[in-house]
């Protein structure tokens, strides 16, 4: 059994680690709440744009934007959103598994894939697989700006316009609640129909006057909508990261507490054994006299 002094040193070390994990848990909780607020604030914007796009595209303007036209799919581009930092449980691993399974399914259909990567964890992971990476970005921090994301996003959209890829998907961790984050791979381009599109079909298409003309408006709105979807996904993933880190750090803090209790028990037993030995020596010495 280790000596009492050595055990006491271990207890102090674990207590120091526990303070760090507790602080990280509190920081993650605060950041998660702030990110949730940004996430909630951005949703109405993208939903409103989506409804207007649906209305304009259904109008008889004799124009179909390339982002609305389905084509034969031979190659797909995936915009992967991961974290820059670790200590967030299996968040990234679960997302990467989902992406690899989807890529495998497409490969069985003779569909190849290109990647655009946001987040250092995704960059380091997918580089090792030899994928064709069309663009990458890392170091966004806790408050990403849309201007920082546009470069990688435009790389994928330009490839779609030029016919290099036939569809663009986005993969990220969707924030469900504090205890649940769901990895999703969803289509961005061609723009899939939403549930509201069928409702909009019942509405008359001549009850609005558009300024500028519908074609110019549609071109502009589609770009804004896709940018908002990417930003929403990044914020969603960030909220998922902070929630996963909060849970992981709470588990680490609780485990540290359990370990401290176990070490204290061992420490008390070691002290008891030491005291017993000292008493035995005193008794033996007294008997010898």
Curated annotation (Swiss-Prot):
GO biological process, any: proton motive force-driven plasma membrane ATP synthesis
SUPFAM superfamilies: ATP synthase (F1-ATPase), gamma subunit
Spans traversing the lipid bilayer: none
CDD domains, sorted: F1-ATPase_gamma
Membrane topology qualifier: Peripheral membrane protein
One GO MF term: proton-transporting ATP synthase activity, rotational mechanism
Main location: membrane
Location of the protein in the cell: Cell inner membrane
Cellular component GO terms, alphabetical: plasma membrane; proton-transporting ATP synthase complex
Keywords from the UniProt entry: ATP synthesis, Cell inner membrane, Cell membrane, CF(1), Hydrogen ion transport, Ion transport, Membrane, Transport
NCBIfam families, sorted: ATPsyn_F1gamma (TIGR01146), PRK05621.1-1 (NF004144)
Function: Produces ATP from ADP in the presence of a proton gradient across the membrane. The gamma chain is believed to be important in regulating ATPase activity and the flow of protons through the CF(0) complex.
Membership in a protein family: Belongs to the ATPase gamma chain family.
Subunit structure: F-type ATPases have 2 components, CF(1) - the catalytic core - and CF(0) - the membrane proton channel. CF(1) has five subunits: alpha(3), beta(3), gamma(1), delta(1), epsilon(1). CF(0) has three main subunits: a, b and c.
Stated name of the protein: ATP synthase gamma chain
Organism: Haemophilus influenzae (strain PittGG)
Gene: atpG
């Amino acid at each position: 059994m280790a000596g009492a002094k050595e055990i006491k040193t271990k207890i102090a070390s674990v207590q120091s680690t526990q303070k760090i994990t507790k602080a990280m848990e509190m920081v993650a909780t605060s950041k998660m709440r702030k990110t949730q607020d940004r996430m909630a604030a951005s949703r109405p914007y993208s939903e409103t744009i989506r409804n207007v796009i649906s209305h304009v595209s259904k109008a008889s303007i004799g124009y179909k934007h390339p982002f609305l036209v389905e084509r034969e799919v031979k190659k797909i581009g995936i915009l992967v959103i991961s974290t820059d930092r670790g200590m967030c449980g299996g968040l990234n691993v679960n997302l990467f598994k989902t992406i690899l399974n989807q890529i495998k399914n497409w490969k069985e259909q003779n569909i190849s894939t290109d990647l655009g990567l946001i987040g250092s964890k995704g960059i380091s992971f997918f580089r090792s697989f030899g994928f064709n990476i069309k663009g990458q970005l890392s170091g966004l921090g806790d408050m990403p700006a849309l201007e920082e994301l546009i470069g990688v996003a435009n790389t994928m959209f330009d490839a779609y316009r030029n016919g290099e890829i036939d569809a663009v998907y986005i993969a990220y961790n969707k924030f469900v609640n504090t205890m649940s984050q769901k990895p999703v791979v969803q289509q961005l381009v061609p723009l899939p129909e939403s549930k509201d599109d069928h409702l909009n079909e019942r509405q008359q298409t001549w009850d609005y006057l558009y300024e500028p003309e519908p074609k110019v408006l549609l071109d502009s709105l589609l770009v804004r909508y896709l940018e908002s979807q990417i930003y929403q996904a990044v914020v969603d993933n960030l909220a998922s990261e902070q929630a996963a880190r909060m849970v992981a750090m709470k588990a680490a803090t609780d485990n540290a507490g359990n370990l401290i209790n176990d070490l204290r028990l061992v420490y008390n037993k070691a002290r008891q054994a030491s005291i017993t030995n000292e008493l035995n020596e005193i008794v033996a010495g007294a008997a010898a006299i």
